[in-house]
């Protein structure tokens, strides 16, 4: 992305100093421009120091939250067997791209701003520009893949059953990274370190012509913003409609009766029957083996003794005791879709100002520079980088099973030392077994003895 504000918005390399800078470029620079010295801004030292302190604090907070949060996501999704689903595979790729944005881009954007010059050389300049573009492209395409996967799983379950596997998700993720890598090749080709004044270097995009720069900006705006936005809006709109109709017209009893009629009429075991659909025919509840239906959680198979124990101890459902299984699955899907919608909305809110600024600068560089230089462009950059740290917060606040997986992972990494039980004194009576212990003893005895 044309986003690297490397030594662009600070007033200069010294108190009250004028900075010779190109008139054309704004975000990283993409045209040659004419060097002109701007008059120093008349601001107090206290205001300048406060702005610098706020900027450093915000950058540091976003950087730490992005690194810690996305590393936590990668570890939890990698270690938890219950979270190894198709949707979470794309969320894992999204976390890797956000981590790449934080580690490979943020330090090399902040430090040149503080120092007033770019000191890292041409190789780092090209690499930072390339990795930033790849990260944004992978994030966008991953969100599109998640939307299409959820649409297929919820609205087209029979067709999704054929290809909705983790191996297929892995192939899509690899294709996403390869496509993003190829799409962003122009960035390292047309990025270089250029002098912007006396002892001032800048990492800039230098396109062959203004027409090519405008074409590139419009192309990115269409491929990575408008088209993905329309696809995701349509997909989640259809998903919301399907879930709303499923919750409104819940026909478990109708489908059970239809399954019985179908089995009596020669269907093998009533295969493929599930909850009734509002259009009058039964809809199959097809999903991955072991998945509970929300797309972000896998129900691991339990051993036979555990199943027997759950059957013995499970309370008998009565009227009004809670939602039925099919309705509970729909509610779980609805919660996951709501979380994914929040992720999509936050992503586009964070990157909309950057796309708008880049397009404005491509067609009206001087006007964009006058309007956005200084605090506005600093806020735009901070907002775009904040997109790398919002997803972990969304997962923790809106994904109960992810929170539980985080706690389980922390408990596994930092186990508590076992507490020693106090031994009874010789004159004390032995402890009376609790009801739970008696239940386990009785169950073990029954299971061991077997029938008659």
Swiss-Prot record:
<dbReference type="GO" id="GO:0007186">
    <property type="term" value="P:G protein-coupled receptor signaling pathway"/>
</dbReference>
<keyword id="KW-1015">Disulfide bond</keyword>
<feature type="region of interest" description="Disordered">
    <location>
        <begin position="256"/>
        <end position="285"/>
    </location>
</feature>
<dbReference type="GO" id="GO:0015054">
    <property type="term" value="F:gastrin receptor activity"/>
</dbReference>
<dbReference type="GO" id="GO:0004930">
    <property type="term" value="F:G protein-coupled receptor activity"/>
</dbReference>
<feature type="transmembrane region" description="Helical; Name=5">
    <location>
        <begin position="219"/>
        <end position="239"/>
    </location>
</feature>
<keyword id="KW-0812">Transmembrane</keyword>
<feature type="compositionally biased region" description="Gly residues">
    <location>
        <begin position="263"/>
        <end position="273"/>
    </location>
</feature>
<feature type="topological domain" description="Extracellular">
    <location>
        <begin position="193"/>
        <end position="218"/>
    </location>
</feature>
<comment type="function">
    <text>Receptor for gastrin and cholecystokinin. The CCK-B receptors occur throughout the central nervous system where they modulate anxiety, analgesia, arousal, and neuroleptic activity. This receptor mediates its action by association with G proteins that activate a phosphatidylinositol-calcium second messenger system.</text>
</comment>
<feature type="glycosylation site" description="N-linked (GlcNAc...) asparagine">
    <location>
        <position position="28"/>
    </location>
</feature>
<keyword id="KW-1133">Transmembrane helix</keyword>
<keyword id="KW-0472">Membrane</keyword>
<comment type="similarity">
    <text>Belongs to the G-protein coupled receptor 1 family.</text>
</comment>
<feature type="topological domain" description="Extracellular">
    <location>
        <begin position="361"/>
        <end position="376"/>
    </location>
</feature>
<keyword id="KW-0675">Receptor</keyword>
<dbReference type="Pfam" id="PF00001">
    <property type="entry name" value="7tm_1"/>
</dbReference>
<feature type="glycosylation site" description="N-linked (GlcNAc...) asparagine">
    <location>
        <position position="7"/>
    </location>
</feature>
<dbReference type="InterPro" id="IPR009126">
    <property type="entry name" value="Cholcskin_rcpt"/>
</dbReference>
<feature type="disulfide bond">
    <location>
        <begin position="125"/>
        <end position="203"/>
    </location>
</feature>
<feature type="topological domain" description="Cytoplasmic">
    <location>
        <begin position="398"/>
        <end position="452"/>
    </location>
</feature>
<dbReference type="GO" id="GO:0032870">
    <property type="term" value="P:cellular response to hormone stimulus"/>
</dbReference>
<feature type="topological domain" description="Extracellular">
    <location>
        <begin position="121"/>
        <end position="127"/>
    </location>
</feature>
<feature type="transmembrane region" description="Helical; Name=4">
    <location>
        <begin position="172"/>
        <end position="192"/>
    </location>
</feature>
<dbReference type="InterPro" id="IPR000276">
    <property type="entry name" value="GPCR_Rhodpsn"/>
</dbReference>
<keyword id="KW-1003">Cell membrane</keyword>
<dbReference type="GO" id="GO:0005886">
    <property type="term" value="C:plasma membrane"/>
</dbReference>
<feature type="topological domain" description="Extracellular">
    <location>
        <begin position="1"/>
        <end position="57"/>
    </location>
</feature>
<dbReference type="InterPro" id="IPR017452">
    <property type="entry name" value="GPCR_Rhodpsn_7TM"/>
</dbReference>
<feature type="transmembrane region" description="Helical; Name=2">
    <location>
        <begin position="100"/>
        <end position="120"/>
    </location>
</feature>
<feature type="transmembrane region" description="Helical; Name=7">
    <location>
        <begin position="377"/>
        <end position="397"/>
    </location>
</feature>
<feature type="lipid moiety-binding region" description="S-palmitoyl cysteine">
    <location>
        <position position="413"/>
    </location>
</feature>
<dbReference type="InterPro" id="IPR000314">
    <property type="entry name" value="Gastrin_rcpt"/>
</dbReference>
<feature type="transmembrane region" description="Helical; Name=3">
    <location>
        <begin position="128"/>
        <end position="148"/>
    </location>
</feature>
<feature type="topological domain" description="Cytoplasmic">
    <location>
        <begin position="240"/>
        <end position="339"/>
    </location>
</feature>
<feature type="transmembrane region" description="Helical; Name=6">
    <location>
        <begin position="340"/>
        <end position="360"/>
    </location>
</feature>
<feature type="topological domain" description="Cytoplasmic">
    <location>
        <begin position="149"/>
        <end position="171"/>
    </location>
</feature>
<keyword id="KW-0807">Transducer</keyword>
<feature type="glycosylation site" description="N-linked (GlcNAc...) asparagine">
    <location>
        <position position="34"/>
    </location>
</feature>
<feature type="transmembrane region" description="Helical; Name=1">
    <location>
        <begin position="58"/>
        <end position="78"/>
    </location>
</feature>
<keyword id="KW-0325">Glycoprotein</keyword>
<keyword id="KW-0449">Lipoprotein</keyword>
């Amino acid at each position: 992305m044309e986003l690297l504000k490397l030594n662009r918005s600070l007033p200069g390399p010294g108190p009250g100093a004028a900075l010779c800078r190109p008139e054309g470029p704004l975000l990283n620079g993409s045209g040659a421009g004419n060097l002109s010295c701007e008059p120093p801004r008349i601001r107090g030292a206290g205001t300048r120091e406060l702005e610098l302190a706020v900027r450093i604090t915000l950058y540091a907070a976003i950087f730490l939250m992005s690194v810690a949060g996305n590393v936590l996501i990668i570890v939890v999704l990698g270690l938890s067997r219950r979270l190894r689903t198709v949707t979470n595979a794309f969320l894992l790729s999204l976390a890797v791209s956000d981590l790449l944005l934080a580690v490979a881009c943020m330090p090399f954007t902040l430090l040149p701003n503080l120092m007033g010059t770019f000191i890292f050389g041409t190789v780092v300049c090209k690499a930072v520009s390339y990795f930033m573009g790849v990260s944004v492209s992978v994030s966008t395409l991953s969100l599109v893949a998640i939307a299409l996967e959820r649409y297929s799983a919820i609205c087209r379950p029979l067709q999704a059953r054929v290809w909705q596997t983790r191996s297929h998700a892995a192939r899509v993720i690899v294709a996403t990274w390869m496509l993003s890598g190829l799409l962003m090749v122009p960035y390292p080709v047309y990025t270089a370190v250029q002098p912007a004044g006396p002892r001032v270097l800048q990492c800039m995009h230098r396109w062959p012509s203004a027409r090519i720069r405008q074409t590139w900006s419009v192309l990115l705006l269409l491929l990575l913003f408008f088209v993905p936005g329309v696809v995701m809006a349509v997909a989640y709109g259809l998903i919301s409609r399907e879930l709303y109709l499923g919750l409104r017209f819940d026909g478990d009893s109708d489908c059970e009766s239809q399954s019985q009629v179908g089995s009596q009429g020669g269907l093998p075991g009533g295969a493929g029957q599930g909850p009734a659909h509002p259009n009058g025919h039964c809809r199959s509840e097809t999903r991955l083996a072991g998945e509970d239906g929300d797309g972000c959680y896998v129900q691991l198979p339990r051993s036979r003794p555990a199943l027997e124990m759950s059957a013995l101890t499970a309370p008998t459902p009565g009227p009004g005791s809670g939602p039925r299984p099919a309705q509970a699955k729909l509610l779980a899907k609805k919660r996951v879709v709501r979380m994914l919608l929040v992720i999509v909305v936050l992503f586009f809110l964070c990157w909309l100002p950057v796309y708008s600024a880049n397009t404005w600068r491509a067609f009206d560089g001087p006007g964009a520079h006058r309007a956005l230089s200084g605090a506005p462009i600093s806020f735009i950059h901070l907002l775009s980088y904040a997109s790398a740290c919002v997803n972990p917060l969304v997962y923790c606040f809106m994904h109960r099973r992810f929170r539980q997986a985080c706690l389980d992972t922390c408990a596994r990494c930092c186990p508590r030392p076992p507490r020693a039980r106090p031994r009874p004194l010789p004159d004390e009576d032995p402890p009376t077994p609790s009801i739970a212990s008696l239940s386990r003893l009785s169950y073990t005895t029954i299971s061991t003895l077997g029938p008659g």
